Amino acid sequence: MLKKGKIGMKPTNKIIGIVDGDVLVYRACNKAIKDNLDVRKTFDDIYEEVKMNTACDKYSLHISGGGNFRKEIEQTFLKYKGKRRDKPDNYLECRDYVAKKYKPIMVPNYEADDTASVEAFKYIKNKQLYMLITLDKDWKTIGGLFYNLLHNNLSAVSKVEGIEFFHQQLLTGDAVDNIPGIEGVGPVKANKILKDKSLIEQFEAVIKAYKKHYPEDAISRLN
């Protein structure tokens, strides 16, 4: 079980940046291969650029800990993250370097977005200001300040918007993670199902939609 007490910094009146280290590692690996660079220095440069662009007072770096508890959940339809590409040849070199130098938050069987969620929810409870720094849209389900590393822009996602986004994902699925959702349901249909409903009503509508389309295994598909 993921322990909240070991994740996060002490409360401060300054903003804490919660960084998706997985994204930075992959960026460093790909750039180093493409331009024939030292992957370790490449990571350092990328991380420093992120800090310069976001200007937070403190930073918390998160990297997936290896393995994933979701893969232990029995599924009869699609393999979780079955569509992901193989890791770059220099991935382990970069990841090990980052682990030793930066001491990121890494928990076995949990992904970076899992540990980032734990840290963010801890800050919400303590009224600590934080910024999520990633390009992974899944992090929007957490809510808060959201810095998009792909577009280099900052937006604010409320807790309600984060839950609404999660409900939409349950309906549409996630092609990147190989999560099917409901066949034939895209953003337009999902919005129609969720429109003008409270959060509880939205979740009830999601369950109803799954039971309608998949009467035999609706609940297992939602796991």
Predicted regions and their residues:
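Extended two-metal-dependent nuclease catalytic cores across DNA- and RNA-processing enzymes
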Residues: L2-K14, I33, C56, K81-N223
